[in-house]
């Protein structure tokens, strides 16, 4: 559903931000 799509996009966004910030350690 829409919720799962948003959740997936959010996780991808966090990964992208982490790479941009210099590879911050994962949380969750």
Swiss-Prot record:
Expressed by the skin glands. One of its GO terms (biological process) is defense response to fungus. Keywords: Antibiotic, Antimicrobial, Cytolysis, Fungicide, Hemolysis, Secreted. Peptide CPF-B1: Has antimicrobial activity against Gram-negative bacteria E.coli ATCC 25922 (MIC=5 uM) and multidrug-resistant A.baumannii (MIC=4-8 uM), against Gram-positive bacteria S.aureus ATCC 25923 (MIC=5 uM) and methicillin-resistant S.aureus and against fungus C.albicans ATCC 90028 (MIC=25 uM). Has some hemolytic activity against human erythrocytes at high concentrations. It comes from Xenopus borealis (Kenyan clawed frog). Coiled coil: none annotated. This is Caerulein precursor fragment B1. It comes from the Eukaryota. GO terms for cellular component: extracellular region. Its main location: secreted. Belongs to the gastrin/cholecystokinin family. The keyword Secreted applies. Disulfide bonds: none annotated. It is found in: Secreted.
């Amino acid at each position: 559903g829409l919720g799962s799509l948003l959740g997936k996009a959010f996780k991808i966004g966090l990964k992208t931000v982490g790479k941009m910030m210099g590879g911050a350690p994962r949380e969750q």
